[in-house]
Amino acid sequence: MAPTTATKDDSGYGDERRRELQAFDDTKLGVKGLVDSGVKSIPSIFHHPPEALSDIISPAPLPSSPPSGAAIPVVDLSVTRREDLVEQVRHAAGTVGFFWLVNHGVAEELMGGMLRGVRQFNEGPVEAKQALYSRDLARNLRFASNFDLFKAAAADWRDTLFCEVAPNPPPREELPEPLRNVMLEYGAAVTKLARFVFELLSESLGMPSDHLYEMECMQNLNVVCQYYPPCPEPHRTVGVKRHTDPGFFTILLQDGMGGLQVRLGNNGQSGGCWVDIAPRPGALMVNIGDLLQLVTNDRFRSVEHRVPANKSSDTARVSVASFFNTDVRRSERMYGPIPDPSKPPLYRSVRARDFIAKFNTIGLDGRALDHFRL
Protein backbone atom coordinates (compact mmCIF):
# COMPACT_ATOMS: atom_id res chain seq x y z
CA MET A 1 0.00 0.00 0.00
CA ALA A 2 1.03 3.62 -0.30
CA PRO A 3 2.66 5.20 2.75
CA THR A 4 0.35 6.54 5.43
CA THR A 5 -0.50 10.20 5.16
CA ALA A 6 1.46 12.40 7.52
CA THR A 7 -0.66 14.60 9.75
CA LYS A 8 -0.20 18.31 10.21
CA ASP A 9 1.34 17.62 13.61
CA ASP A 10 4.00 15.14 12.49
CA SER A 11 4.86 15.89 8.86
CA GLY A 12 6.74 19.16 9.19
CA TYR A 13 3.62 21.24 8.63
CA GLY A 14 4.12 24.50 10.45
CA ASP A 15 3.32 28.11 10.02
CA GLU A 16 6.10 28.68 7.50
CA ARG A 17 5.17 25.69 5.35
CA ARG A 18 1.53 26.65 5.48
CA ARG A 19 2.40 30.15 4.29
CA GLU A 20 4.44 28.71 1.42
CA LEU A 21 1.57 26.46 0.38
CA GLN A 22 -0.92 29.31 0.59
CA ALA A 23 1.32 31.69 -1.35
CA PHE A 24 1.68 29.12 -4.14
CA ASP A 25 -2.05 28.45 -4.19
CA ASP A 26 -2.94 32.14 -4.18
CA THR A 27 -1.18 32.69 -7.52
CA LYS A 28 -3.81 30.44 -9.17
CA LEU A 29 -1.15 29.67 -11.79
CA GLY A 30 -0.11 26.22 -10.68
CA VAL A 31 3.24 24.60 -11.38
CA LYS A 32 3.29 26.08 -14.89
CA GLY A 33 3.38 29.51 -13.26
CA LEU A 34 6.56 28.56 -11.42
CA VAL A 35 8.16 27.35 -14.64
CA ASP A 36 7.14 30.53 -16.46
CA SER A 37 8.74 32.59 -13.69
CA GLY A 38 12.07 30.97 -14.51
CA VAL A 39 12.69 28.98 -11.32
CA LYS A 40 15.94 27.02 -11.40
CA SER A 41 15.22 25.08 -8.22
CA ILE A 42 11.85 23.84 -7.04
CA PRO A 43 10.23 25.20 -3.86
CA SER A 44 10.62 23.06 -0.76
CA ILE A 45 6.89 22.25 -0.69
CA PHE A 46 7.58 19.95 -3.68
CA HIS A 47 10.51 18.13 -2.07
CA HIS A 48 9.75 14.45 -1.48
CA PRO A 49 11.77 12.50 1.10
CA PRO A 50 14.70 10.45 -0.25
CA GLU A 51 13.03 7.15 0.64
CA ALA A 52 10.07 8.06 -1.58
CA LEU A 53 12.38 8.85 -4.50
CA SER A 54 14.97 6.10 -4.17
CA ASP A 55 13.38 3.80 -6.74
CA ILE A 56 11.56 6.37 -8.86
CA ILE A 57 14.67 7.81 -10.50
CA SER A 58 15.78 4.44 -11.85
CA PRO A 59 12.92 1.94 -11.63
CA ALA A 60 13.85 -1.72 -11.68
CA PRO A 61 14.04 -3.19 -15.19
CA LEU A 62 11.88 -6.13 -16.07
CA PRO A 63 13.78 -9.30 -15.15
CA SER A 64 14.77 -11.68 -17.93
CA SER A 65 12.15 -14.07 -16.57
CA PRO A 66 9.39 -11.64 -15.59
CA PRO A 67 6.97 -12.50 -12.81
CA SER A 68 3.50 -13.63 -13.76
CA GLY A 69 1.63 -10.75 -15.34
CA ALA A 70 4.74 -8.55 -15.75
CA ALA A 71 3.59 -7.09 -19.06
CA ILE A 72 0.61 -4.96 -20.01
CA PRO A 73 -1.79 -7.12 -22.05
CA VAL A 74 -3.23 -5.80 -25.29
CA VAL A 75 -6.93 -6.41 -25.92
CA ASP A 76 -7.92 -6.01 -29.56
CA LEU A 77 -11.61 -5.15 -29.66
CA SER A 78 -11.83 -6.10 -33.33
CA VAL A 79 -11.62 -9.76 -32.27
CA THR A 80 -14.91 -11.32 -33.28
CA ARG A 81 -15.09 -14.19 -30.77
CA ARG A 82 -16.58 -12.64 -27.65
CA GLU A 83 -15.37 -15.57 -25.53
CA ASP A 84 -11.79 -14.66 -26.44
CA LEU A 85 -12.29 -11.03 -25.44
CA VAL A 86 -13.88 -12.03 -22.14
CA GLU A 87 -10.98 -14.36 -21.32
CA GLN A 88 -8.38 -11.70 -22.19
CA VAL A 89 -10.11 -9.13 -20.00
CA ARG A 90 -10.53 -11.63 -17.14
CA HIS A 91 -6.82 -12.45 -17.18
CA ALA A 92 -5.69 -8.81 -17.41
CA ALA A 93 -8.06 -7.52 -14.73
CA GLY A 94 -7.22 -10.36 -12.37
CA THR A 95 -3.43 -10.22 -12.66
CA VAL A 96 -1.95 -6.97 -13.94
CA GLY A 97 -4.94 -4.70 -13.36
CA PHE A 98 -4.03 -2.77 -16.52
CA PHE A 99 -4.64 -3.49 -20.20
CA TRP A 100 -4.33 -1.68 -23.50
CA LEU A 101 -7.31 -1.34 -25.81
CA VAL A 102 -6.73 -1.20 -29.56
CA ASN A 103 -9.34 -0.90 -32.32
CA HIS A 104 -11.51 0.62 -29.60
CA GLY A 105 -13.64 2.89 -31.77
CA VAL A 106 -12.66 6.26 -30.26
CA ALA A 107 -11.68 8.44 -33.21
CA GLU A 108 -8.06 9.54 -33.44
CA GLU A 109 -9.20 13.10 -34.15
CA LEU A 110 -11.03 13.15 -30.81
CA MET A 111 -8.02 11.81 -28.93
CA GLY A 112 -5.67 14.21 -30.67
CA GLY A 113 -8.08 17.08 -30.12
CA MET A 114 -8.21 16.38 -26.40
CA LEU A 115 -4.43 16.28 -26.02
CA ARG A 116 -3.99 19.46 -28.07
CA GLY A 117 -6.75 21.22 -26.17
CA VAL A 118 -5.27 20.37 -22.78
CA ARG A 119 -1.87 21.63 -23.89
CA GLN A 120 -3.30 24.84 -25.37
CA PHE A 121 -5.33 25.56 -22.24
CA ASN A 122 -2.32 25.18 -19.95
CA GLU A 123 -0.02 27.12 -22.26
CA GLY A 124 -2.56 29.81 -23.12
CA PRO A 125 -3.64 32.99 -21.33
CA VAL A 126 -3.17 32.77 -17.57
CA GLU A 127 -6.46 34.60 -17.02
CA ALA A 128 -8.35 31.59 -18.39
CA LYS A 129 -6.73 29.31 -15.82
CA GLN A 130 -7.12 31.72 -12.93
CA ALA A 131 -10.83 32.09 -13.69
CA LEU A 132 -11.33 28.34 -13.18
CA TYR A 133 -8.94 27.88 -10.25
CA SER A 134 -10.75 26.36 -7.28
CA ARG A 135 -10.40 23.89 -4.41
CA ASP A 136 -14.16 23.34 -4.19
CA LEU A 137 -14.50 19.62 -5.00
CA ALA A 138 -18.22 20.11 -5.67
CA ARG A 139 -17.56 22.27 -8.75
CA ASN A 140 -18.04 20.36 -12.00
CA LEU A 141 -15.36 22.37 -13.81
CA ARG A 142 -12.21 23.54 -12.08
CA PHE A 143 -8.47 24.01 -12.44
CA ALA A 144 -5.97 23.49 -9.63
CA SER A 145 -2.57 22.09 -8.75
CA ASN A 146 -2.64 19.04 -6.43
CA PHE A 147 -6.16 18.37 -5.13
CA ASP A 148 -4.54 17.28 -1.84
CA LEU A 149 -2.09 20.21 -1.66
CA PHE A 150 -2.83 21.03 1.98
CA LYS A 151 -2.99 17.38 3.10
CA ALA A 152 -0.05 15.71 1.36
CA ALA A 153 3.38 15.51 2.93
CA ALA A 154 4.81 16.90 -0.33
CA ALA A 155 3.25 18.41 -3.44
CA ASP A 156 3.57 16.86 -6.91
CA TRP A 157 4.84 18.64 -10.02
CA ARG A 158 1.65 18.86 -12.11
CA ASP A 159 -1.46 20.93 -12.83
CA THR A 160 -4.97 19.56 -13.36
CA LEU A 161 -8.13 20.55 -15.21
CA PHE A 162 -11.16 18.65 -13.88
CA CYS A 163 -14.46 18.31 -15.75
CA GLU A 164 -17.51 16.32 -14.70
CA VAL A 165 -18.93 15.05 -17.99
CA ALA A 166 -21.76 12.99 -16.45
CA PRO A 167 -24.26 13.26 -14.95
CA ASN A 168 -23.84 17.05 -14.47
CA PRO A 169 -21.68 18.48 -17.27
CA PRO A 170 -20.96 22.19 -17.37
CA PRO A 171 -22.57 24.22 -20.15
CA ARG A 172 -20.46 24.02 -23.29
CA GLU A 173 -19.86 27.78 -23.27
CA GLU A 174 -18.18 27.49 -19.85
CA LEU A 175 -15.57 25.03 -21.08
CA PRO A 176 -12.11 26.43 -21.87
CA GLU A 177 -12.07 27.57 -25.49
CA PRO A 178 -9.42 25.01 -26.63
CA LEU A 179 -11.63 22.17 -25.33
CA ARG A 180 -15.07 23.58 -26.07
CA ASN A 181 -15.66 21.53 -29.20
CA VAL A 182 -14.06 18.28 -28.07
CA MET A 183 -14.49 17.65 -24.32
CA LEU A 184 -18.12 16.50 -24.32
CA GLU A 185 -17.73 14.59 -27.59
CA TYR A 186 -14.71 12.74 -26.23
CA GLY A 187 -16.64 12.01 -23.04
CA ALA A 188 -19.49 10.49 -25.06
CA ALA A 189 -17.06 8.33 -27.03
CA VAL A 190 -15.24 6.94 -23.99
CA THR A 191 -18.59 6.36 -22.25
CA LYS A 192 -19.70 4.15 -25.13
CA LEU A 193 -16.39 2.30 -24.91
CA ALA A 194 -16.68 1.96 -21.12
CA ARG A 195 -20.15 0.39 -21.45
CA PHE A 196 -18.64 -2.34 -23.65
CA VAL A 197 -15.71 -2.88 -21.27
CA PHE A 198 -18.13 -3.17 -18.33
CA GLU A 199 -20.00 -5.86 -20.30
CA LEU A 200 -16.78 -7.84 -20.80
CA LEU A 201 -15.85 -7.45 -17.13
CA SER A 202 -19.32 -8.60 -16.05
CA GLU A 203 -19.16 -11.67 -18.26
CA SER A 204 -15.66 -12.47 -17.02
CA LEU A 205 -17.18 -12.70 -13.52
CA GLY A 206 -19.75 -15.19 -14.80
CA MET A 207 -22.49 -12.57 -14.58
CA PRO A 208 -24.93 -11.22 -17.20
CA SER A 209 -23.31 -8.63 -19.44
CA ASP A 210 -25.30 -5.77 -17.90
CA HIS A 211 -24.53 -6.74 -14.28
CA LEU A 212 -22.00 -4.00 -13.46
CA TYR A 213 -23.97 -1.44 -15.46
CA GLU A 214 -27.11 -2.27 -13.47
CA MET A 215 -25.02 -1.85 -10.30
CA GLU A 216 -24.69 1.79 -11.43
CA CYS A 217 -20.92 1.59 -11.75
CA MET A 218 -20.68 4.15 -14.56
CA GLN A 219 -23.25 6.84 -13.83
CA ASN A 220 -20.49 9.35 -13.16
CA LEU A 221 -17.67 10.30 -15.54
CA ASN A 222 -14.96 12.73 -14.48
CA VAL A 223 -12.44 13.68 -17.15
CA VAL A 224 -9.20 14.73 -15.47
CA CYS A 225 -6.64 16.46 -17.69
CA GLN A 226 -3.09 16.35 -16.34
CA TYR A 227 -0.32 18.72 -17.40
CA TYR A 228 3.25 17.94 -16.30
CA PRO A 229 5.56 20.92 -16.94
CA PRO A 230 9.32 20.41 -17.30
CA CYS A 231 10.92 20.18 -13.87
CA PRO A 232 14.31 21.81 -13.17
CA GLU A 233 15.01 19.30 -10.38
CA PRO A 234 13.21 16.06 -11.30
CA HIS A 235 15.28 14.11 -8.78
CA ARG A 236 13.56 15.97 -5.89
CA THR A 237 9.90 15.44 -6.72
CA VAL A 238 7.35 13.43 -8.73
CA GLY A 239 4.60 14.10 -11.25
CA VAL A 240 2.11 11.89 -9.40
CA LYS A 241 3.08 9.91 -6.32
CA ARG A 242 2.29 6.20 -6.21
CA HIS A 243 -1.42 5.51 -5.77
CA THR A 244 -4.39 3.47 -6.88
CA ASP A 245 -7.54 4.94 -8.44
CA PRO A 246 -10.57 4.99 -6.12
CA GLY A 247 -13.44 4.42 -8.56
CA PHE A 248 -14.48 1.45 -10.70
CA PHE A 249 -12.11 1.87 -13.61
CA THR A 250 -10.17 4.47 -15.57
CA ILE A 251 -9.58 4.92 -19.30
CA LEU A 252 -6.27 6.71 -19.87
CA LEU A 253 -5.20 8.70 -22.93
CA GLN A 254 -1.52 9.70 -23.08
CA ASP A 255 0.67 11.74 -25.38
CA GLY A 256 3.83 10.27 -26.89
CA MET A 257 6.22 11.30 -24.12
CA GLY A 258 5.58 8.41 -21.77
CA GLY A 259 6.15 8.58 -18.04
CA LEU A 260 3.62 6.15 -16.59
CA GLN A 261 5.12 3.56 -14.26
CA VAL A 262 3.18 0.54 -12.97
CA ARG A 263 4.05 -1.80 -10.11
CA LEU A 264 4.00 -5.27 -11.65
CA GLY A 265 4.27 -8.64 -9.96
CA ASN A 266 2.94 -9.58 -6.53
CA ASN A 267 -0.49 -8.23 -7.50
CA GLY A 268 0.86 -4.72 -7.96
CA GLN A 269 1.48 -4.12 -4.29
CA SER A 270 4.55 -4.09 -2.03
CA GLY A 271 7.25 -6.36 -3.38
CA GLY A 272 6.50 -5.92 -7.06
CA CYS A 273 8.81 -4.07 -9.42
CA TRP A 274 8.18 -0.66 -10.98
CA VAL A 275 8.15 -0.76 -14.77
CA ASP A 276 8.15 2.06 -17.32
CA ILE A 277 5.17 1.70 -19.66
CA ALA A 278 6.03 2.99 -23.12
CA PRO A 279 3.23 4.81 -24.96
CA ARG A 280 1.34 2.82 -27.59
CA PRO A 281 0.18 5.12 -30.42
CA GLY A 282 -3.57 5.08 -30.93
CA ALA A 283 -4.25 2.85 -27.93
CA LEU A 284 -6.14 3.62 -24.75
CA MET A 285 -5.29 2.08 -21.39
CA VAL A 286 -7.76 0.70 -18.85
CA ASN A 287 -6.89 0.23 -15.21
CA ILE A 288 -9.04 -1.32 -12.51
CA GLY A 289 -10.03 0.92 -9.59
CA ASP A 290 -10.39 0.23 -5.88
CA LEU A 291 -14.19 -0.05 -5.84
CA LEU A 292 -14.08 -2.70 -8.57
CA GLN A 293 -11.50 -4.63 -6.55
CA LEU A 294 -13.85 -4.36 -3.57
CA VAL A 295 -17.01 -5.58 -5.33
CA THR A 296 -15.12 -8.44 -7.01
CA ASN A 297 -13.58 -9.48 -3.68
CA ASP A 298 -10.03 -9.23 -5.06
CA ARG A 299 -10.80 -11.17 -8.25
CA PHE A 300 -9.84 -7.98 -10.08
CA ARG A 301 -6.82 -5.96 -8.99
CA SER A 302 -6.41 -2.23 -8.50
CA VAL A 303 -2.68 -1.76 -8.97
CA GLU A 304 -0.32 1.00 -7.86
CA HIS A 305 1.01 3.37 -10.49
CA ARG A 306 2.85 6.70 -10.55
CA VAL A 307 4.42 9.31 -12.83
CA PRO A 308 7.97 10.66 -12.29
CA ALA A 309 8.64 14.36 -12.66
CA ASN A 310 9.07 15.50 -16.25
CA LYS A 311 12.78 15.50 -17.15
CA SER A 312 12.31 17.27 -20.48
CA SER A 313 13.96 20.67 -20.72
CA ASP A 314 11.26 22.26 -22.85
CA THR A 315 8.19 20.05 -23.39
CA ALA A 316 5.31 19.32 -21.04
CA ARG A 317 3.70 15.90 -20.78
CA VAL A 318 -0.09 15.67 -21.17
CA SER A 319 -2.57 12.94 -20.29
CA VAL A 320 -6.35 12.61 -19.98
CA ALA A 321 -7.85 10.18 -17.46
CA SER A 322 -11.55 9.28 -17.62
CA PHE A 323 -12.73 8.04 -14.22
CA PHE A 324 -15.93 5.99 -14.12
CA ASN A 325 -17.90 5.72 -10.89
CA THR A 326 -21.43 5.75 -9.54
CA ASP A 327 -23.17 9.07 -8.94
CA VAL A 328 -21.62 9.64 -5.53
CA ARG A 329 -23.83 12.65 -4.76
CA ARG A 330 -27.14 10.85 -5.16
CA SER A 331 -26.54 7.13 -4.84
CA GLU A 332 -27.46 5.41 -1.58
CA ARG A 333 -26.41 1.99 -2.90
CA MET A 334 -24.15 -0.05 -0.66
CA TYR A 335 -21.25 -1.67 -2.50
CA GLY A 336 -19.89 -4.90 -1.10
CA PRO A 337 -18.27 -8.04 -2.48
CA ILE A 338 -20.37 -9.99 -4.98
CA PRO A 339 -21.40 -13.18 -3.13
CA ASP A 340 -19.05 -16.08 -3.80
CA PRO A 341 -19.68 -19.41 -2.02
CA SER A 342 -16.02 -20.37 -2.42
CA LYS A 343 -14.59 -17.29 -0.70
CA PRO A 344 -15.66 -15.20 2.30
CA PRO A 345 -16.05 -11.43 1.83
CA LEU A 346 -12.80 -9.52 2.29
CA TYR A 347 -14.39 -6.07 2.58
CA ARG A 348 -17.29 -4.46 4.38
CA SER A 349 -20.00 -2.79 2.32
CA VAL A 350 -19.77 0.96 1.82
CA ARG A 351 -21.57 3.73 -0.01
CA ALA A 352 -19.49 5.09 -2.87
CA ARG A 353 -19.74 8.64 -1.48
CA ASP A 354 -18.20 7.48 1.79
CA PHE A 355 -15.45 5.66 -0.06
CA ILE A 356 -14.61 8.72 -2.16
CA ALA A 357 -14.82 10.95 0.92
CA LYS A 358 -12.19 8.76 2.57
CA PHE A 359 -10.03 9.04 -0.57
CA ASN A 360 -10.37 12.83 -0.62
CA THR A 361 -9.54 13.02 3.09
CA ILE A 362 -6.31 11.03 2.95
CA GLY A 363 -5.23 12.11 -0.55
CA LEU A 364 -2.75 10.14 -2.62
CA ASP A 365 -0.49 9.39 0.34
CA GLY A 366 -2.79 6.60 1.54
CA ARG A 367 -5.18 4.02 0.13
CA ALA A 368 -8.89 4.23 0.88
CA LEU A 369 -9.48 0.54 0.10
CA ASP A 370 -7.46 -0.59 3.10
CA HIS A 371 -9.85 1.17 5.48
CA PHE A 372 -12.71 -1.11 4.38
CA ARG A 373 -10.90 -4.44 4.51
CA LEU A 374 -12.29 -6.89 7.05
UniProtKB/Swiss-Prot annotation:
It is an enzyme of class 1 (oxidoreductase). GO terms for cellular component: cytoplasm. Disruption phenotype: Loss of DIMBOA biosynthesis. Binds 1 Fe(2+) ion per subunit. Residues 214-326 form the Fe2OG dioxygenase domain. The keyword Transit peptide does not apply. Its main location: cytoplasm. Pfam families: 2OG-FeII_Oxy, DIOX_N. It catalyses: DIBOA beta-D-glucoside + 2-oxoglutarate + O2 = TRIBOA beta-D-glucoside + succinate + CO2. Keywords: Cytoplasm, Dioxygenase, Iron, Metal-binding, Oxidoreductase. One of its GO terms (molecular function) is metal ion binding. InterPro entries: DIOX_N, IPNS-like_FE2OG_OXY, IPNS-like_sf, Oxoglu/Fe-dep_dioxygenase_dom. It comes from the Eukaryota. It is found in: Cytoplasm. This is DIBOA-glucoside dioxygenase BX6. It comes from Zea mays. The lineage of its organism: Eukaryota, Viridiplantae, Streptophyta, Embryophyta, Tracheophyta.
